Amino acid sequence: MGTVLAFDFGEKRIGVATGETMLCSAHPLTTIHAESNEDRFAAIGKLVAEWQPEQLVVGLPTHADGTPHEMTRLATKFGERLARRFNLPVSFADERLTSLDAEARLRETGRNSKSAKPLLDAVAAQLILQTWFESPHHVIPTQPSA
């Protein structure tokens, strides 16, 4: 397949990770800090142009029992916009506990919460992508719509 970009969607920040399907390994890339959707999608557009992914993955937040909540709806809407805007397939991957896992991983590297904050969302996106690589049966694909 090729390159994949993954997103940890948030209302204030979007973490981004990249990976290769041949290696099934994910790496944190960046965190997008943008107020408006226009600025967010412009930044994502630059990443799509640079990395030329064949697939996009969006973390799908849910309650611990798997039931949806407001951020589930917003992340789904974000994924649908990605599919339409970039004409790329988008999959949703379970992101339960990825932020906690990302915090723990950054603490293990000796970073305190303040110094780790800029990396947190990108590491969460990395974990989302790694989950997608390891658990293809847990993804919910969507194709770009006209």
Swiss-Prot record:
Domain of life: Bacteria
Cellular localization per UniProt: Cytoplasm
Keyword terms, alphabetized: Cytoplasm, Hydrolase, Nuclease, Ribosome biogenesis
E.C. no: 3.1.-.-
Gene Ontology BP, a term: rRNA 5'-end processing
Primary location: cytoplasm
Enzyme class: hydrolase
Keyword Nucleus among record annotations: no
A single GO molecular function term of this UniProt record: nuclease activity
Statement: the UniProt record of this protein carries the keyword Protease: no
Gene3D superfamilies: YqgF/RNase H-like domain (3.30.420.140)
A single cellular component GO annotation: cytosol
InterPro entries assigned: RNaseH-like_sf, YqgF, YqgF/RNaseH-like_dom, YqgF/RNaseH-like_dom_sf
Family: Belongs to the YqgF nuclease family.
PANTHER family documented for this protein: POLYNUCLEOTIDYL TRANSFERASE, RIBONUCLEASE H-LIKE SUPERFAMILY PROTEIN
Record function comment: Could be a nuclease involved in processing of the 5'-end of pre-16S rRNA.
Protein name: Putative pre-16S rRNA nuclease
